Amino acid sequence: MLKRLKEKSNDEIVQNTINKRINFIFGVIVFIFAVLVLRLGYLQIAQGSHYKQIIKNDENITVNESVPRGRILDRNGKVLVDNASKMAITYTRGRKTTQSEMLDTAEKLSKLIKMDTKKITERDKKDFWIQLHPKKAKAMMTKEQAMLADGSIKQDQYDKQLLSKIGKSQLDELSSKDLQVLAIFREMNAGTVLDPQMIKNEDVSEKEYAAVSQQLSKLPGVNTAMDWDRKYPYGDTLRGIFGDVSTPAEGIPKELTEHYLSKGYSRNDRVGKSYLEYQYEDVLRGKKKEMKYTTDKSGKVTSSEVLNPGARGQDLKLTIDIDLQKEVEALLDKQIKKLRSQGAKDMDNAMMVVQNPENGDILALAGKQINKSGKVTDYDIGTFTSQFAVGSSVKGGTLLAGYQNKAIKVGETMVDEPLHFQGGLTKRSYFNKNGHVSINDKQALMHSSNVYMFKTALKLAGDPYYSGMALPSDISSPAQKLRRGLNQVGLGVKTGIDLPNETRGQIEPLTNNPGNYLDLSIGQYDTYTPLQLSQYVSTIANDGYRIQPHIGLTIHESTNKDEVGPLKKKINGTVLNKVNNTEKEIKQIQEGFKMAFNEKDGTGYVSFKDTVVPTAGKTGTAEVFQNGEPRVNSTYIGYAPIDDPKLAFSIVYTNQPVPPPWLTGGDLGRDVINYYFKQLGKDDKNKDKDK
């Protein structure tokens, strides 16, 4: 019994101890809760307005930061244009940042990086001297201050006079350290509010980059970043076609300001300025990185957050075969130098366009220029921005115009003979200067008969030829009909290529000059681009369908890896028109082109008789003058294989001697045809092995 009472007493003691501890803990909790309630009440009632003001003073700012552009690749995925990353120091000016605060930051930053001071102008130095020495500047303008106060002069006049008084002695006060600060300060001022501005992005050392990164908390608005430059793995090949991108310092070029600002760009954005970079800007530009900065009432950044990491631009794959392009360029370079060494002193341009006639894919677009000293430079853009007299290459278009207007019929025979007109004018063919030869339309193309074309043009004017006749007095209507026929195959109209600055050639009035009308029929009047010639021969090869040429092939999503991303869009060549001719008429021109390159009497036979695949085409020689001396432009157009054309080409050599040293254009066309189809055969064999 006593034992039980003792055990019960011990249990009560333990329970009392537990209860006391629980009560103590509850007491502490109640006390803490009471303190929190009191603190919350204090913050809400006593300090509420203070924190509301802090929130009110805070500002969330979204800033877009530049990202690299998309790559440009050839049709086989070889990278033609890429990005080379480089370290950079940037500055973003806040809404409320003062000039003195910027200057203070510039002074701190100047101790960490070394700037190039070559861009500093005298005006920059004068403005900076005024900012550093406001009292001295004021002392120089005592009289002018009074005049400014009483309205005798305006502020801009005052400023102008102040600048004029700052001379060499004042500017010499600026030390080398001052100039370092100024070099930074001027870049800071070049940017707009909330747009990151490049302070230094050339030759930033790892030491500078690390030093600035460590001091960012003491450098308001300054940041370290990665910038980029375009790099070209194939050197100068197609460099002109690629075009240029503006630098960070340049931003949007003045002449393109309205165009880009209307699309929501900032003035300091890097943009495509020319050719492919400009044409495909919407594709190649990246999605900017979006940063949200929170600033206090003084404009200082208190926190930052990445809203969108951004992405580099999409990749653009071209129709160009870079291996073919390099081969064409090498052949052009070799031939233009050889011509110069053989006495072609005025020879200045050699150009070639290679395309797929079925779909408009441009496979190669090459041009070379040679100056008086013999230096050869690339002139790829000249294939669509420069025009030349092309001679007899156009004769297929002349015959199509004749068929369209019922001036001649398929297979019609005419006599090639010297044509004698009233007033003593005589016109003749080169292959038959004095004889009388009966030829049909196909043979006219094979022999390149001028007379057949002249007689066709006269019939088109409703005035068939007879010896001693006067030339038609009014040729405006037939000239329009002839040009309309040439337009349908791509001569005298823009091709529609996806590149800016294309010319349609030089198309002069023909109202009252019948002699020029006849010259038009043989390619001796209007001028055309090599690209127009390529579209023209492609139209013949493609059974009369004129296809829009294009250099863009596909657009791909960007990835973080080297491989090409998923396909987003395919760029197709559209049918612009079909010539207004029958199938029989088009076949007749194709047969004539075939004969010109494959019959012994054909003008292109010597060069194209032994190509690895059968080739059809037309030659041309245009008479021109250079420095008062007679010269010729040599042209070749063609396609292969004859029965299923996969490649079409045009070649233009300008200002060659009379006669040219050798068949330069023909040799070039033959070599390119052989290279392409031999290479195609190798590729097909490799594909079979892989299966």
Name every feature range the model reports, one short phrase each.
Residues E65-S66, T98-L103, N201-Y209, K231-Y234, ...:
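Solvent-exposed, acidic/flexible segments
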Residues V212, L276-K289, Y293, V301-K338, ...:
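N-terminal leader/targeting segments and the immediately adjacent pre-domain N-terminus
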Residues M1-Y278, D282, M291-V301, A457, ...:
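Membrane-proximal periplasmic segments of bacterial cell-envelope enzymes
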Residues G391-L400:
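Active/ligand-binding-proximal structured segments within catalytic/core domains
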Residues N64-P68, K288, K345-N349:
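Short, small/polar residue-rich loop motifs at catalytic or cofactor-binding pockets
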Residues V81-D82, T294-P309, I320, L324, ...:
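Beta-lactam-recognizing serine transpeptidase/beta-lactamase-like catalytic domain environment
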Residues K52-N64, L324-A344:
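Short, basic/aromatic recognition patches
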Residues S100-K111, A210, Q214, R239, ...:
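Solvent-exposed, polar/charged alpha-helical surfaces in well-ordered, non-transmembrane soluble domains
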